[in-house]
Amino acid sequence: MKLVRFLLFPIALLYGLVMSIRNLLFHCRIWTPRRFQTPLIGVGNLATGGTGKSVVIDYLLTAFKKKFRLAVLSRGYGRSSKGFVLGKADSTASTLGDEPFQFLRKHPEVTVAVAEKRVEGVEHLLNQFSKTEAILLDDVMQHRWIQPHLLVLTTTFNQPYSQDFVLPMGNLREWRKGARRADIILITKTPPKATPADRDRIKQSLKLASNQSVYFCATAYAKFIDGAAHKPLVDIAIKKFILVTGIADAAPLVSYLKGLNFDFEHLEYPDHYAFSKATVGRIEHKAQNTFILTTEKDFGRLQPLISKKVLLYYLPIQLKFLNAQEEQAFLLQIEDQLQ
């Protein structure tokens, strides 16, 4: 392992240098980000994935969609389409991407769109939906051509960006100091047993600026499953099942299900995995005498491919703050920008 890290170190330095030059060009206004009058709330991260950005977007939609006319703009990673695409009733995970399709399915009253070029995406949204009061920008941390009014950076408790390194030696898309652009740092996936001392240790390692806020939150799993039917989670304890995941970090989910003493076989695939008919056929073969449980994100990709004879469920998740005061402070900080 030390040899591998040694060999990757020069490549990481070169990659980091390129990102530093890029950020410097924006910092010196040689390249100028576009700022819109309509409030833009950005959510992003420094790491390559698995920090809970989508859960944060979902949380914000749930919290504010009844008070404001919201839209969501994402890149639509892994989609088969190109350019600006507006989410519609006949959209799929293939045409929109996993996360945008999930937002569209869960929040049909919200405008959802995808575009590689976010500036053009925002322009399209505002031209087509002139009454839009705010736009949530998904995965926008490194998309410097657009300037959010407020930027939320997500990083996990067990692997904060302060303990990581740039690609390919580590998982960071840019150097740690890029976090200075964020207004809010959300420490996601905080363990329930984390003590105040543990949280203070994380805070100190981040070396926050005076204008930055930090909040700790966890992933809360629903007490029910959905999909083939809506039923209590405890009902699946009666037999062994197949767990299928295609996300960046399935470890917390696996740990949670094992903690409930559920008996299952885990079929793990890479993040945003494009399930083929052959792969789905093998999954169905394993699930002949049982059912399949998956994540809400993977459900959108699997559902069109899975035979209706096979029971396919997903376990919803949501963002949960460690205390009500922190949650209220976070919501007020967001709402101040939406007003």
Where are these regions (language model features)?
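Short, flexible loop segments at boundaries between secondary-structure elements
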Residues: A220, P270-A274, K309-Q337
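Conserved beta-strand elements of the Class I
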Residues: A71-L73, L153, K240-V244
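Phosphate/Mg2+-binding loops and adjacent switch elements
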Residues: Y77-L208
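C-terminal accessory "lid"/substrate-recognition subdomains
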Residues: K2, P160-F291
